[in-house]
């Protein structure tokens, strides 16, 4: 597995405090295209938005994330996702700082867990597609039902819009993100976000 994506300047890093000169969007696109061509020539296949591998060597760990699978967060600052038979989906975050993590572990009161929240039904479509549309492979419609616990009718209007915009194509059993959908991935994902209720 090889990841090929643009450097993100994160807060509290040397790059953040002393940012390098970054290429403009046209140069970034040229760099991405050149990398894509060289990887393809070397026998690597793109299987996620920024992930390449030799055939049969996709990162199973990443595939589980992108297919909205469950995983345990173990260690300082780790994140987890757990689905339960009663339909709940829970996101967890462990204590970030090692000293606090060890102190919480030693006290054994909800050991080393910093936050835990239930993913609301209205947030599940966005969470599902935010992960699933990172993959190049077609998305089985049944995966949406199986992993979110929601019927397809909850997203039909948005799916129809995405197809009309050219972001997705559809068969009776699958959705496929298009080249245009990859370019406008943020717009596509925003369409699945729950609307904020006004009070």
Locations of regions flagged by a protein language model:
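Minor-groove-contacting beta-hairpin "wing" of winged helix-turn-helix DNA-binding domains
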Residues: 174-178
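Short, amphipathic alpha-helical interaction segments positioned at domain boundaries
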Residues: 180-199
């Amino acid at each position: 597995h090889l990841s090929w994506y643009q450097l993100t300047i994160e807060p509290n890093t040397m790059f953040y405090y002393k940012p390098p000169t970054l290429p403009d969007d046209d140069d970034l696109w040229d760099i991405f295209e050149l990398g894509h061509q060289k990887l393809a020539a070397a026998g690597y296949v793109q299987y996620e938005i920024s992930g390449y591998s030799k055939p049969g060597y996709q990162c199973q760990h990443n595939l589980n994330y992108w297919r909205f699978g469950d995983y345990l967060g173990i260690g300082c600052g780790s994140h987890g996702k757990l689905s339960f038979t009663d339909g709940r989906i829970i996101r967890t975050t462990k204590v970030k700082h090692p000293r606090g993590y060890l102190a919480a572990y030693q006290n054994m009161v909800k050991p080393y867990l910093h936050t835990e929240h239930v993913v609301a039904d209205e947030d599940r479509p966005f969470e599902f597609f935010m992960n699933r549309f990172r993959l190049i492979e077609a998305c089985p419609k049944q995966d949406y039902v199986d992993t979110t616990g929601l019927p397809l009718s909850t997203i039909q209007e948005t799916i129809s819009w995405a197809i009309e915009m050219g972001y997705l194509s559809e068969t009776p059993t699958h959705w496929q993100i298009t080249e245009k959908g990859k370019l406008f991935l943020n717009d596509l994902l925003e369409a699945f976000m729950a609307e904020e209720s006004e009070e």
